[in-house]
Amino acid sequence: MTYPKIYLKPKKEESVLRLHPWIFSGAVARIDGQPEEGAVVEVFAADGRLLGVGHYQIGSIAVRLLAFDEVTIDHAFWLDRLRSAYNLRQMLGLDHAPENDTYRLVYGEGDRLPGLVIDMYADTAVMQAHSVGMHHARRDIATALRELLGDRLQAIYYKSDGTLPFKAALDHTDEYLLGRYSGGEHLATERGLRFGIDWLKGQKTGFFVDQRENRRLLEQYASDRTVLNMFCYTGGFSVYAMRGGARAVHSVDSSSKAVSLTERNVALNFPDDDRHRAFAEDAFDYLRRAGNDYDLIILDPPAFAKHRDVLRNALQGYRKLNAAAFEKIRPGGILFTFSCSQVVSRNDFRLAVFTAAAQTRRHVRILHQLTQPADHPVSIYHPEGEYLKGLVLEVE
């Protein structure tokens, strides 16, 4: 198949030769033809060498490469890439695990499918496009996914409201590409715990599957502790803390809907358990009035920075938030603190936490350095795929 052609400026092919999948608009010399946004294009070096095939998009990232050779983007291509991603999850023991039916099946560049995310919740796949090209390909991808998983897959929900470029002229509606809404509550299981998943109206695909291993680690620290879970959203950390034997768990979120989700998930797993309380309140306001009763605190805020132009303000926010936690946590307490901002580097985040600790004059030791789980694999050629970073700290 013949695709529109994009030619790069001289010496702008180096990153592609190192297998980085992004081509920035400043590297483009000319475009032969008039490809529509989201179209498949071929990319060439200035000397005419074919560099790869990818999705064209208007914006800072002009092309997201799907392959670094000459290929046809057809059903066989989508099926091959999805099978590769699925095989990895099988190797990790995530598919049809007896006490776990919740995992990420496709993680963008890490699975050589830039701009695509697919999360599995039992027999439902929730698909999210982060590029116009993946949006246009959504039905082809759904067809390949159904062929791969067969009857194990009963529904595919496409949810890309908020993840597609707002300037793109797209006729977009979140919808079921397979199956339909069956009514009632959607439930999924993570390590033997049940969670209500709202992929229709919830954040992301309905649940933060990237914190699975970190929630499991927190469970090991929770025994006989008084736990504060800030930015609780669906209450994942709270539920794990309760199973870990926490003396009391307080969940805080500025969203009353998030608080309701947390209370529902606690009730699903620990009905009539009076150890849990939830508060709909601003995080800083709550920490300001809180006593010094907590000996395990979780800080898992939403992304403070999605663009580099607000990085400085984001780092100040992390410093302020962690300082407030350091001031409140009891001696010998444990702090789980996270950043999910891709533009905040691991070193930047650690420096912000260090500054907060120094400001409060607490003695702090690093026990664990955390990241995203293996079903969010990072291509060694695309370090930008590592976005989640966390620290587990012992505070004297």
Annotate each predicted stretch with a short phrase.
Residues 248-253:
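Conserved SAM-binding motif I beta-strand of class I
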Residues 1-122:
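Non-catalytic accessory regions of SAM-dependent methyltransferases
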Residues 257-298:
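S-adenosyl-L-methionine
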Residues 224-233:
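Conserved class I S-adenosyl-L-methionine
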Residues 234-247:
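Conserved SAM-binding loop of SAM-dependent methyltransferases across substrates and taxa
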Residues 294-324:
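Mobile active-site "lid"/loop adjacent to the S-adenosyl-L-methionine
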Residues 334-396:
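C-terminal catalytic and target-recognition region of SAM-dependent MTase-like enzymes
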Residues 106-119, 135-208, 216:
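Non-catalytic substrate-recognition/targeting regions of SAM-dependent transferases
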